Amino acid sequence: MLAVVGAAALVLVAGAPWVLPSAAGGENLKPPENIDVYIIDDNYTLKWSSHGESMGSVTFSAEYRTKDEAKWLKVPECQHTTTTKCEFSLLDTNVYIKTQFRVRAEEGNSTSSWNEVDPFIPFYTAHMSPPEVRLEAEDKAILVHISPPGQDGNMWALEKPSFSYTIRIWQKSSSDKKTINSTYYVEKIPELLPETTYCLEVKAIHPSLKKHSNYSTVQCISTTVANKMPVPGNLQVDAQGKSYVLKWDYIASADVLFRAQWLPGYSKSSSGSRSDKWKPIPTCANVQTTHCVFSQDTVYTGTFFLHVQASEGNHTSFWSEEKFIDSQKHILPPPPVITVTAMSDTLLVYVNCQDSTCDGLNYEIIFWENTSNTKISMEKDGPEFTLKNLQPLTVYCVQARVLFRALLNKTSNFSEKLCEKTRPGSFSTIWIITGLGVVFFSVMVLYALRSVWKYLCHVCFPPLKPPRSIDEFFSEPPSKNLVLLTAEEHTERCFIIENTDTVAVEVKHAPEEDLRKYSSQTSQDSGNYSNEEEESVGTESGQAVLSKAPCGGPCSVPSPPGTLEDGTCFLGNEKYLQSPALRTEPALLC
């Protein structure tokens, strides 16, 4: 085993010997020197050198201890050995903690002092052994079965999924080598020639530890005679709804039947035989077409492998090349659901994927004005979009979908259209507030001006309203105030009325003349008469018109009783006139 590895051993050189008190008679026995430890997988090799004492009588013993243990433990394979090397395994120790070794020389009852090496962590100093390889030949392919380093050991027990393998294959008669990289324990190398001898070798690699093994021993194998039944090739898988569609190439005849099987992805990453781990697909058994459809529920793992076999009567082809399927790459998620938040000139769009397989994918949205057909597309690796520099108070519509371009150049369907109206911008808001302020201020100013105007009109131009006495006069029925005119000329007789509060006027008509009588508590004839022009209006209407003369006229009496406060005389056509506006002094009544 060690000769195969051929790797430089890790040499742990001991420092200056630590001399312990020797046993009786061992004063001249020196401890071993140049102690080093070489580890490959779980196999330890401890080496040292002696000082040239007679090897026939000197033996050596080794002990070890770990960081978790203060007590030194004996190495069973390294007790009282006569050689300067011993090999052993420590399967029960923790390879991730520091371990320390020491060796001493012994001769009879005498022993040397112990010579210790510096502590080290076995996991980081261990080497990987070449993987074990087993070959299986077909007519046009070779199956390579690989066992990882330290198959049943403790050193790489947790690292098996991290190993990758490099396979070098060549025809025995040629030096042209082909390199194949694999992460599986079984690798099928197709497209070989029948009845041809191929040789190959394999090495293991641990990328994170930056370690690799040596190549395994070269093995050669010959492919078989070409099979009468060709192998189905060019397997393709597509997803349609909730089903998978498996297609392959084959020059089929009417009697050729096909069957397909699937293998969970994790099964190929485990060592050992897996021929019994392939599972049949019921809807792809004994089909005559070069395709079959099966439900996604048939396969319950996220990753799996497919292969197809052809048969005709008693003849059966080899299994096709294994097709790796990642369900995340083939199953399209449903259309996403979007939410849109509107701002003044911005729309915030969040794309909510409806399936967990959307993780790590890209997203695309398209948006446009509701009144336009010009669409704008945006693509991101995240579900959040910000649409800036939009028009305020404008309706925009948005759709989104999930992209698989990095994997299979496929996309989901677009989501439902969602339309949202942007809010007023800051500039529009200022103008709206300013406009409302101007309108409000204008209304207040107009109202104030109107109030001032009404006040000025009331003060400077009071309403021309007749006195209350005239209002009361005109409030009587017209028929009672009419004075019938006759063709005869009549005279007016005036009387002086003194100290009167009430003036009663009675009008009587006679066929020959108009007779007017005045009654009062006290009356006295002044002997003064006043004639005024008589004004006649509308003889057709038959109404008498009052004539008025300024006080102090022909009557020569200042402010005579019977006048109004504004100094106006009136004709005595009234039947009754009673008003506090009449003066109590003697007045001239015409």
Swiss-Prot record:
PANTHER family for this protein: INTERFERON ALPHA_BETA RECEPTOR 1 (PTHR20859:SF54), INTERFERON/INTERLEUKIN RECEPTOR (PTHR20859)
Region span, Important for interaction with TYK2: 483-492
Name of protein: Interferon alpha/beta receptor 1
Its membrane topology: Single-pass type I membrane protein
Family, similarity comment: Belongs to the type II cytokine receptor family.
Domain of life: Eukaryota
Positions of region (Disordered): 514-545
Quaternary structure note: Heterodimer with IFNAR2; forming the receptor for type I interferon. Interacts with TYK2. Interacts with STAT1 and STAT2. Interacts (serine-phosphorylated form) with FBXW11, the substrate recognition component of a SCF (SKP1-CUL1-F-box protein) E3 ubiquitin-protein ligase complex. 3Interacts with SHMT2; this promotes interaction with ABRAXAS2 and the BRISC complex. Interacts with TRIM10; this interaction prevents association between IFNAR1 and TYK2.
Cytoplasmic topological segments: 450-590
Glycosylation sites: N43, N109, N181, N214, N314, N370, N409, N413
UniProt modified residues of type Phosphoserine: S526
UniProt-listed Pfam families: Interfer-bind, Tissue_fac
Main location per the UniProt record: membrane
Extracellular-side segments: 27-429
Disulfide bridge partners, by residue number: C78-C86, C199-C220, C284-C292, C397-C419
Cell location: Cell membrane; Late endosome; Lysosome
Signal sequence region: 1-26
